Every structure is written in structure tokens, then in C-alpha cells.
Amino acid sequence: MSTRPYPWHPLRHWLEGWRRQRLLRQLADPALAFVLGPAPPDEWVSLDCETTGLDVRRDHIVSIGAVRIQGQRILTSQRLELLVRPPHGVSADSVRIHQLRERDLAQGLPVQDAVLQLLHFIGSRPLVGYYLEFDLAMINRVLRPLLGIALPQPRNEVSALYYDHKFRQLPPHRQQSPEIDLRFDTLMRDLGLPQSRAHDAVNDAVMAALAFIKLRQLQGAR
């Protein structure tokens, strides 16, 4: 889901406070309450995971990449790159996609340590990603037992923002049954953005951040 700013309203303010208090009570460790604090203004974290497959119940994270965004800038000096040691070997198909072999991952972090590092890197900043739902499902499967809750930060889904952008450009008669290509290559090419040939988590996070910034510019940073 994408987040959009709303004008301040007493009921909305009360509901947000109520939700925060409810989540605070569910936290497994009070030291992690920073995830529910106020986010730094005009900052986000773009993230991506590489995994052994697409089954959120059975597959495993092998790398995590994240980068901070501030206003219209990607803070490449503030990025996170983590290799994760999976409990089982990686298949040949998996290696062909993310180029991470078993020996590359042998010195990786245990997944619990990796997601806790990610949690501290994110803080309370809203999240950005391309098909973020999958990445968060993989992360939350590990994090929920440690944190007591799923990642509570607002989400900005790049494919949804792009869909909204393209939908607004369609004439009314085509808005009834729109056909909008949401493939990442198409999205990046249409937005006039460069694509990295490297397929790894941090590069994918940077490209999602580029698309997010461009789409905000096209929307007038509403």
C-alpha cells in the first residue's frame, strides 16, 4: 500500500495514538519501542531482499539491502548490505538469479541478527519498495517472534504509485479497464531512469528509491 499525507484531524490523531499504545503493549522487548516513535521528517528507507525462492512459508532470505532517502536525495553513504546464512543449501536456480553461492553465504549472519540490524537501520522511517509485500512477508516471518509485532512503519509501494501515475494519464473511456504494465524494467524505462545491471538487494533498493523520488516529483510531492 502507498501512504499519502492527510490533513491533521483530531479523530485521526487520536486513532494513531491509540494504535501506537496498542502496539507498544504488544512489543516483546521495550528496548525496540523506537520503531513506534516519530519518524524523521521527509525521510524513508528503501529496502529489498534476495531469497531462495518465492514461497514465503518455506523459502529463506539470503541477503538484505536498504538505503535511506532524505527529501529528493538517496543517501548512498547510509546504506545497509547484509548477507544471510540460510539454514539449508541454495539451489542452482536460486544462484542463477542472485549470484550468491553457498560459500558466499557461509559467513553470512544468522537471519535473526540480520533482521534486527535492519530494524535499527530503519528506525521509525516509512518504507519504500517494489512489490514490498513479499519482502515484508519474509522479514516479518522472522521478526514477529522477536518483536512481538510485524513491522509497523507506513509503506510506499512503488508499483502502486506508478499505477496511480499512469491511470491519471488515461482518457476516461480507458480507465474502466486499464491495462498498465507494472514490470520493473518497463516502469524504470518509462520514467527515464537508469537501471543497474547488478541484481543484488542493495542495487534493487537504490533503483526502487530512484523510482519513488521520480514519482513523487511527478505528483508534485503531495
What role is predicted for each listed range?
Residues M1-H9:
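Long, acidic (Asp/Glu-rich), low-complexity accessory segments flanking structured domains
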Residues W14-G17, Q21-N140, R144-P152, P178-H199:
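Conserved non-catalytic scaffold segment of RNase H-like nuclease domains
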Residues C49-G53, A160, M207:
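Short, glycine/acidic-enriched loop or turn micro-motifs at the edges of active sites
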Residues L54-V56, Y163, L210:
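Conserved protein kinase catalytic core
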Residues N203-A211:
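Acidic, divalent-metal-coordinating active-site segment for phosphoryl/phosphodiester hydrolysis
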